[in-house]
């Protein structure tokens, strides 16, 4: 399983950049393996992201904005969902991963 974070390296919006950095920093700090997918560099990846976000999770108008998070091809959520899971200490569940505490206990 690979966590994939769809982001935009050349976003002109400071808020989007901060959200992307927050997700990446959290994953790095918790040693969660992930892949960054830059949708500004690949139209194919951008279209894949748009197509694989469930209709009920898409905005009423416009396209979904990065960051968008997937576990392989399974949609996890956007930044707001990530932030909520971070606040409630359920990020591993949000990402479809076993918690690191559970894996350490099994070792």
From Swiss-Prot:
Any GO CC annotation of this UniProt entry: cytoplasm
Key words of the record: Nucleus, SH3-binding
Short motif (SH3-binding): ranges: 61-67
CDD domains noted in UniProt: GRX_SH3BGR (cd03030)
Disulfide bonds: none
An example Gene Ontology molecular-function term: SH3 domain binding
Localisation: Nucleus
Keyword Nucleus: yes
Keyword Nucleotide-binding (UniProt): no
Similarity section: Belongs to the SH3BGR family.
Protein name according to UniProt: SH3 domain-binding glutamic acid-rich-like protein 2
């Amino acid at each position: 399983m690979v966590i994939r974070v769809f982001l935009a390296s050349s976003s002109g919006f400071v808020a989007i950049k901060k959200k992307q950095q927050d997700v990446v920093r959290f994953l790095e700090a918790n040693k969660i393996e992930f892949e960054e997918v830059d949708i500004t560099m690949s139209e194919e990846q951008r279209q894949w992201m748009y197509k694989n976000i469930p209709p009920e999770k898409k905005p009423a108008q416009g396209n979904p904005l990065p960051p968008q998070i997937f576990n392989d091809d399974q949609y996890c959520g956007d930044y707001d969902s990530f932030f909520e899971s971070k606040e409630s200490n359920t990020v591993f569940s949000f990402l479809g991963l076993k918690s690191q505490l559970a894996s350490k206990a099994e070792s």
